[in-house]
Amino acid sequence: MRNIKLTIEYDGKRYSGWQRLGDDDKTIQGKIEKVLHQMTNEEIEIIGSGRTDAGTHARGQVANFKTNTEIELSEMIDFMNRYLPRDIVIKRIEEMPERFHARYNAVGKKYSYYVWNNVIPSAFERNHSFYFPQELDMDKLNAACEN
């Protein structure tokens, strides 16, 4: 059995988070598992390195799944990116040792928060940042980051 690692990027604004809940098709996990089933005709459960909440985005979410398919990795990534919604992208695919587990082998997580600090709002940044048109108190922000 093969153990496949994915590095995933997604814009989570249309989704209920990472974790599939029942037959909920509004999750990142659910969308990926549906495409994996189309590709392999296997019932596959994908394991994420962590979970994201509703509306949260990811630039490098790692996940893995086990499969018996003999499809080449290059064909897998092409298929997945063709059939996944455009706001979910497989950035990298690798075959891993049997013991690899995305959650248990994770070494860290990085969270980034973006503030659009300008008098004029941005049409492009509005879904990916917090708009704050007033002057920021950088001393208070830095102190908050230390706590």
Stretches found by the model and what they are:
Residues 1-147:
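Structured-RNA-binding interfaces characteristic of tRNA pseudouridine synthases
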